[in-house]
């Protein structure tokens, strides 16, 4: 099973990716982790990437694709792989296609923007323990304080509504076009085209898991 999960921040991709990697026995390919591993291992591409990053530059798509190709030759990719946070842009998707990297499915997890804002801006954490709550879906026993210590809960900067809205705007402008890219390719009936599936990301984790399983069998 070789696939890409698409969807806005807060759509639950991380939770579903964990289920899929376990279910199919495939690794989650994250370009961030891959870059760090290549730099640490001192591979030729890793050293090249380190040079760029040390100079404060952005690693080129060509270099990323080279790292992806290297990563996919490793034994744990024999049964497939799941791309996490990649590709993010049309040029990256084009580069992936040109490199002949096979895909079986591209799955879009769709969640209305208002739901995402509520999900993310309602999160609260207890910094010392990492315990997390949600003002609506998983509230503490007493408002604004940790159940165990009674210490105040905080809202992380990442979860503030203005930050969430900014991240959603970046997604709409940069990554959302991939939805059209992959759905058009899937409809073209080209030999290498992946199947494109869209599922609703609204509901319980198990409900979404079930929708995802059905989508990957159709």
Swiss-Prot record:
Main location: cytoplasm
Keyword set includes Transferase: yes
GO cellular component annotations of the record: cytoplasm
Pathway(s) served: Purine metabolism; AMP biosynthesis via salvage pathway; AMP from ADP: step 1/1
Enzyme Commission (EC) number: 2.7.4.3
InterPro entries the UniProt entry points to: Adenyl_kin_sub, Adenylat/UMP-CMP_kin, Adenylat_kinase_CS, Adenylate_kinase_lid-dom, P-loop_NTPase
One Pfam family this sequence matches: ADK_lid
Binding site for ATP: 10-15, 123, 132-133, 203
Keywords noted in UniProt: ATP-binding, Cytoplasm, Kinase, Nucleotide biosynthesis, Nucleotide-binding, Transferase
Enzyme class label: transferase
One GO BP annotation of this record: AMP salvage
Localization of this protein: Cytoplasm
Chain positions recorded as AMP binding sites: 31, 36, 57-59, 85-88, 92, 156, 167
Region (LID): 122-159
Catalyzed chemical reaction(s): AMP + ATP = 2 ADP
Keyword Transmembrane helix listed: no
Gene3D superfamilies (UniProt xref): P-loop containing nucleotide triphosphate hydrolases (3.40.50.300)
Alphabetical list of CDD domains matching this protein: ADK
Function summary: Catalyzes the reversible transfer of the terminal phosphate group between ATP and AMP. Plays an important role in cellular energy homeostasis and in adenine nucleotide metabolism.
Assembly: Monomer.
Name of protein: Adenylate kinase
Source species taxonomy: Bacteria, Pseudomonadati, Pseudomonadota, Betaproteobacteria, Burkholderiales
């Amino acid at each position: 099973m070789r696939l890409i999960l698409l969807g806005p921040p807060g759509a639950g991709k991380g939770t579903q990716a964990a289920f899929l990697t376990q279910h199919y026995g495939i690794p989650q390919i994250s370009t961030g982790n891959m870059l760090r591993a290549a730099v640490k291992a001192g591979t030729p591409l890793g050293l090249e990437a380190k040079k760029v990053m040390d100079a404060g530059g952005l690693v080129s798509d060509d270099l990323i694709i080279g790292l992806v190709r290297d990563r996919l030759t490793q034994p744990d990719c024999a049964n497939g792989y799941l791309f996490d946070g990649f590709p993010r842009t049309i040029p990256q998707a084009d580069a992936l296609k040109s490199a002949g990297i096979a895909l079986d499915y591209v799955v879009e997890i769709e969640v209305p923007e208002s739901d995402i804002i509520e999900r993310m801006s309602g999160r609260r954490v207890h910094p010392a323990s990492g315990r997390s709550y949600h003002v609506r879906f998983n509230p503490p026993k007493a408002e604004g304080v940790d159940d165990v210590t009674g210490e105040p809960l905080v809202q992380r900067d990442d979860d503030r509504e203005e930050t969430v809205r900014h991240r959603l705007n970046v997604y709409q402008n940069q990554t959302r076009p991939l939805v059209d890219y992959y759905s058009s390719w899937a409809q073209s009936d080209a030999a290498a085209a992946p199947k494109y599936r869209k599922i609703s990301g609204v509901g319980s984790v198990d409900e979404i898991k079930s929708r995802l399983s059905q989508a990957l069998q159709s």
